[in-house]
Curated annotation (Swiss-Prot):
N-glycosylated. The active site is at S211, E336, H459. Keywords: Allergen, Disulfide bond, Glycoprotein, Hydrolase, Lipid degradation, Lipid metabolism, Secreted, Serine esterase, Signal. Residues 1-19 form the signal peptide. One of its GO terms (cellular component) is extracellular region. Glycans are attached at N120, N144, N369, N397, N473, N533. Lipolytic agent that may be involved in distributing the venom via degradation of blood triglycerides. The recombinant protein degrades triglycerides and exhibits high lipolytic activity toward long-chain triglycerides (tested on tributyrin, trioctanoin and triolein). Does not affect mammalian cells. It is an enzyme of class 3 (hydrolase). GO terms for biological process: lipid catabolic process. GO terms for molecular function: carboxylic ester hydrolase activity. Its EC number is 3.1.1.1. The gene is vCaE. It comes from Bombus ignitus (Bumblebee). This is Carboxylic ester hydrolase.
Length: 555
């Protein structure tokens, strides 16, 4: 006990000393930046530069416009406090003050964390994190960087515009869309251009993200704007082919959205001029008027703008061979569907409601309301239910099957398709994984409103174990070991160009094999390569002709 107290006192003294010594400073072509020192999870000193603007504030006439380059500053920039989060409607929880709207429009800021170099001139690999949140919520500010700072990599986190501010599209040149993805691109370009000033290697940038951030990573492989700005990527539970990652009927949704705000909808310029006058808070509150469980506003084909992010559908870009050809890792967890189902699987009343009204709820729950004709909705709902549940009712005994149904449809099927296509068409290696380790805490606790019941391994449980403050401060030995395995996985890929997980030889995906190959991370003592000829029940889902990911000319 005495040794522990002494260690804590020494750590506090070191921390106090570092905070009071001369602050770290860097010089960039935009101006000087001053940061501050912090301590990593296991006691390493590192530099923190928080709240760095990477684009002009998208306010006033710049609302709904592509991001504009940040201007030079004259005085030293104090980068000692994170910038505000982007305006968003809080979906998964209610803040203590009860206000569901948070953030502001002036939010395009990044945070850069750099291991203390102590005179070492070697450039460090860079990891560029893209946060998730269905393109509607979230922030790079929520990342807990302290564990990553135990390794010799630079970590960059940032905010990008969300919901209507980042993804409204009129389907023409007025607001082509994808402002949020363009924010990401400008942030990535900023890092590519300036990270050398922080001791980072602009030719060793790994982009990685979770959920919508994972699909964003995939989108950067498909955009000519981002080609050359990074050397590898990791998509954690999300790809651009996922149904929620491609917005259907975006112009119609924009008009419906504008109508709820009392704006004219016949002329898109007049409509946007009107939306420009509405307070950000009102715009954020109105997002709930656009019916979509997953992402009412998200990525679109924006070929009408002067600097389009993508001019064709993701599938067309992929099969044409035009995607950026650099290494990629992609994977899923065993109960991806908990992203949605955790809100109801522990509630018998909600399960009964889902059971009784399945035919009407299924098209929205499984996101095919816009991709199948109305006269097929009931037939497909019954077909899916029969496959996963047989003749059983939806209740606590079958809730896991419902979770797997949602996860297969929304994440796992298209993850597999995207990985195989990239491995088949491009030359760079592709690695895939399947994560089924349940730690003491889970993201399902957030979605379920605090329930600690074990519903399975939730969407986000892998990345959050390393990067999120809400569940990353773990104490169980197996959880701590898994943290290190995942940290090795992410950082070894950034440093060496090949991922490492435990002592297993992680093989690349061979698209010519009949069975899908992946690394199964079951627990710290059980990590191995596996294969499947029907992963995510993909053969069943291929029998349903959704109007999704159709190659042009083959509709």
């Amino acid at each position: 006990m005495e040794l522990s107290v002494i260690a804590l006192l020494l750590l506090g003294f070191v921390n106090f000393s570092w905070q009071n010594e001369q602050a770290p400073r860097v010089k960039t072509s935009l101006g000087d930046i001053r940061g501050y020192y912090k301590i990593s999870r296991h006691g390493r000193k590192y530099e923190a530069y928080e709240g760095i603007p990477y684009a002009q504030p998208p306010v006033g006439n710049l609302r709904f416009k592509p991001p504009q380059p940040v201007q030079e500053w004259i005085n030293e920039l104090p980068a000692v406090e994170k910038g505000p989060v982007c305006t968003q409607y809080v979906v998964l929880s209610t803040p203590q003050n009860g206000d569901k709207v948070t953030g502001c429009e002036d939010c395009l800021y990044m945070n850069i964390y750099v291991p203390f170099r102590n005179g070492n001139e070697s450039l460090l690999p860079v990891m560029f994190w893209i946060h998730g949140g269905a393109y509607q919520f979230g922030s790079g500010n929520k990342v807990n960087e302290t564990l990553v700072m135990d390794r010799d990599v630079i970590l960059v986190t940032f905010n990008y515009r969300l919901a209507s501010f980042g993804f409204l599209s009129t389907g023409d040149s007025v607001v082509p869309g994808n402002m949020g993805l363009k924010d990401q691109n400008v942030a990535l370009r900023w890092v590519h251009n300036h990270i050398r000033s922080f001791g980072g290697d602009p030719n060793q940038i790994t982009i990685f993200g979770l959920s919508a951030g994972a699909s964003s990573v995939h989108y950067h492989y498909l955009s000519r704007l981002s080609a050359g700005l990074f050397q590898r990527g990791i998509s954690i539970s999300g790809v651009a082919l996922a149904p929620w990652a491609q917005t259907k009927y975006a112009p119609e949704k924009a008009r419906r959205y504008a109508a709820t705000l009392g704006c004219p909808t016949r002329n898109t310029k007049e409509m946007i001029d009107c939306l420009q006058t509405r307070p950000a808070r009102i715009l954020s509150q109105a997002t709930g008027e656009v019916p979509d469980i997953y992402a009412p506003f998200g990525p679109v084909v924006d070929k009408y703008g002067p600097d389009p992010f993508i001019t064709r559908s993701p599938i067309d870009i992929i099969v044409s061979g035009e995607a950026y050809d650099v290494p990629w890792i992609s994977g899923v967890v065993s109960e991806e569907g908990l992203y949605i189902s955790a809100a109801f699987v522990g509630n018998d009343q909600l399960l009964k409601q889902l059971n009784d009204d399945w035919d009407n709820i299924a098209p929205y729950l499984l996101d095919y309301n816009d991709t199948l004709p109305l006269n097929q909705h009931k037939e497909v709902a019954e077909k899916i239910r029969k496959y996963y549940l047989g003749s059983n009712p939806i209740d606590s005994n079958t809730s896991l099957s419902v979770t797997h149904m949602i996860g297969d449809r929304m994440f796992s099927v298209d993850f597999q398709k995207a990985a195989i296509l990239k491995a088949k068409i491009n030359k760079s290696p592709v690695w895939t994984y399947y994560y089924s380790y349940r730690s003491m805490h889970s993201c399902s606790e957030i979605v379920s409103g605090g329930s600690t019941k074990n519903f399975g391994v939730s969407h986000g449980d892998d990345a959050f174990l390393v990067l999120d403050t809400r569940i990353s401060n773990v104490s169980r030995p197996n959880d701590l070991e898994m943290q290190q395995i995942l940290l090795d996985f992410y950082t070894s890929f950034a440093i060496e160009g090949k991922p490492r997980a435990g002592d297993v030889q992680w093989q690349t995906l061979d698209p010519n094999e009949k069975e899908f190959q992946y690394l199964h991370i079951a627990n710290p003592q059980n990590i191995k390569m596996e294969t499947s000829n029907d992963s995510a029940n993909i053969n069943f889902w291929n029998t349903i002709d959704f109007n999704e990911n159709k190659i042009s000319g083959q509709e």
